[in-house]
């Protein structure tokens, strides 16, 4: 039963939770229980309210990295996954992706990810050091290899990279996730707390509201 109180849809008499972050982890199909633990941990890590907010992570999509270099792309699963991600991106519903490098490069070439130097500032990028992943002169991602995050939540991708989707309208929460993942690195945590970083976030959010065209 779905009810409506004039402002919110309610399921079985309870208000539906507000989604505050959504991500895709491609080629790393997981049990629902593991994905749920990851979602709950991310929500807590970014300071979300478990009673009214939620983080959604989709781990069901698969892509053949070799097929991405074909024209046209013949692999049906890859086609379907590309279409799903494209739909989320154009709807501004997708905030981050965790991908193996070959797949990540495909999306970097489509300018799918925000430039972390512009989004985070020089201090945070310097603190992340060699983990910053560059493609075509853009700091488009951060490598997650050997982090506690990938070990704890069963991410077995070879050289996984995380990127913030350029069209995301929830970049502040996405950056909060990065801060949480690397919180054991004192330099990164300090950089994310710096005034330079706060100014970057404020400027980026203002620009997005002004033009409404950040895709």
Q: What kind of feature is each model-predicted range?
A:
Residues 29-94:
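Extracytoplasmic/periplasmic/luminal assembly and interaction segments
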Residues 157-170, 189-191:
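A bilobed periplasmic-binding-protein/Venus flytrap-type ligand-binding module shared by bacterial periplasmic
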Residues 13-16, 89-91, 108, 154-157:
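Extracellular/periplasmic catalytic domains that process cell-envelope and extracellular macromolecules
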Residues 125-163:
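Periplasmic-binding protein-like
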Residues 79-133:
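Extracytoplasmic "Venus flytrap"/periplasmic binding protein-like
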Residues 27-30, 102-106, 168-169:
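Solvent-exposed loop/turn segments at secondary-structure junctions
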Residues 1-26, 186, 192, 196, ...:
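Gram-positive cell-envelope targeting signals
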